[in-house]
Amino acid sequence: LDDADEIYNIHVDNCTFDGVQDQAVKRTGKSHDIFFNNLVVNGSTVLLDPPYKHYSEWMTHSEMKRAPQSYLLDFAKKPRWSYTIGTELEPMLDTYRAYKDESILNYCKAYPDKMIAADGTITGYKYEDFNLDNCRTGHFLINLYQLYPQPSILKGMKTIFKQLENQPRTKEGVFWHKAIYANQVWLDGIFMGLPFYTKAAPEFKGYKKAKKYWDDAVDQITKTDKRTYDPATGLWKHAWDETHKQFWANPETGQSQHSWARAMGWYTMAMVEVLDALPSNYARRAEVVNLFQKAMAALVKCQDKKTGLWYDVLDVKDPKNYLEATASSMFAYCLLKGYRLGYLDANYKDAGVKAYNGIIKNFIKVNPDKTISLTHCCEVSGLGPGYNPPYVPENKVNKRRDGSFEYYMSEPIRDNDGKGVGPFIWASLEMEQQGLPVASK
């Protein structure tokens, strides 16, 4: 076509092209007025006029279309109290703050309206489970409460904060992940519990007493770093068993076998959020900043050079390993926000932009209904539970979840998992608000 001249009014209708590779396009000016209708390239619909200017809005409204009721996000079949739903709704709320679309705010309000009774009772929440996952949505509630100060929300938050005050701990003082995971510290749990714990302390205990809670949060982060860090790889293991007796734990270190990318994503996002909540003059902020910098430096080293993305298991090179969307979205967000807040230098911003654009090119799919999807999301990965009376009897043991590479590869991959959608929206907001260049689809 380089020699073609005056080709115009081209209509490409009902065509599908697979295996198309990125390459430089030479603009000659000899052809123009090209129109697309129902054109699909590499499984993604090509749109001349996207319905939203910003990916944060586009993904938010895509999810709202897929789940018209917010309590049915993340493939829920009935209303449920879920950290995943909270992890989606919070960046949606931030999208409302950025672009003032009232339909988004109303969507966010609908979740506590449905899930929290007037007396503060939370549907599906069991205090006695001491499940850190069930505390995460408190962080969404405390942010929503600033815009929607309902008494029921306040009562629900107080219940969650009470759980954290009484959460069982390791001998060193770090929260157990759940009662069924007694004596275990998971990187996931740092995100589920500590940001809300840190942010809510001055609200419920007063500013003077809050320092004790802030010190506690920083202590837990530093102790988690110590127990999960692997100097041999320069990465952090998914979890640590204080007893060294769980079937998945190394009997010498208590650590699980591998560095799972999403666990690292939870951990790094937690540190950013704890820093958001700590006062600027709080003496121990630097400890958290230093640990955050240490983690991000390690993650940039294992960023895929070609795509800017990360593999599901960070410490294994194997053809079965795959580039994974939830963790890549988390790391992009942390790199970009860390740069904006001055924790990271410009090299990390560049790594964040590369990661984000890698997500757009490799994981974002435009659907025929003009929604977008985040593909290649690991649905779930965990460890055990192992035999742990009285919490886990023999018939409840799950030996399949042994922390091996083969185990991680066995878990399902799906589109639009909320654990990736939420961080993708956050990363999009960072790109948009910093005016950084976004790749075209």
Regions found by a protein language model. Name each.
Residues 1-48:
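Extracellular parallel beta-helix/beta-solenoid repeat domains
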Residues 26, 47-86, 98-108, 114-138, ...:
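CBM-like carbohydrate-recognition segments
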Residues 62, 91-94, 114, 159, ...:
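Alpha-helical scaffold segments in carbohydrate-active enzymes
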Residues 89, 96, 145, 201, ...:
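Alpha-solenoid repeat junctions
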Residues 99, 200-215, 274-286, 338-346:
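Inter-helical turn/loop segments and adjacent helix faces that build the functional surface
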Residues 106-109, 115-250, 254, 366, ...:
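Extended ligand-binding groove/face enriched in aromatic
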Residues 185-192, 209, 213-216, 252-267, ...:
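Short, contiguous, pocket-lining structural segments
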Residues 266-315:
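Oxyanion-binding "anion nests"
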